[in-house]
Amino acid sequence: MEMKVRVSHWHEDVVVCEVTDDTAPSHILEGLARKGLGYALWGENIETPIIVIDNRGDLTPDQLLAIEAHELGHIMTKSLKETDAELFGIALLRANGRQAAADILLERGVV
């Protein structure tokens, strides 16, 4: 299984799993097939929130940051709404001087 596991850049209580090839567990690959480049696992029954990012296509560092910030937005706002996560992610990236990554989210047109 090839995954990079680390603590989130912006929240020490959130784990990030970066999938780098097709040998990741099937339930993780199925989640990515349904959700796209990333998804967040959080809620009442989840002790440690997890962000899963699909990096099988060699994303740029700014793309990885944009995905992480967006998914962290779902966790921090406790919202399934894409607009809530996107606005949180853009604000987080801007506040941390990562305008190029924020621009990636802005260019998606979610907000």
PLM ranges: what are they?
Residues 66-78:
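Active-site recognition of the HExxH zinc-binding catalytic motif
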Residues 8, 45, 94:
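Acidic surface patches and DE-rich sequence motifs
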Residues 79-111:
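Post-HExxH zinc-binding segment in Zn-dependent metallohydrolases
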Residues 19-62, 75:
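Active-site scaffold of zinc-dependent metalloenzymes
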Residues 1-13:
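Zn2+-dependent metallopeptidase catalytic core
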Residues 14-17, 51-53, 68-69, 85:
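Hydrophobic beta-strand residues in large extracellular and virion-surface proteins
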Residues 61-66, 84:
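Alpha-helical scaffolds flanking conserved acidic
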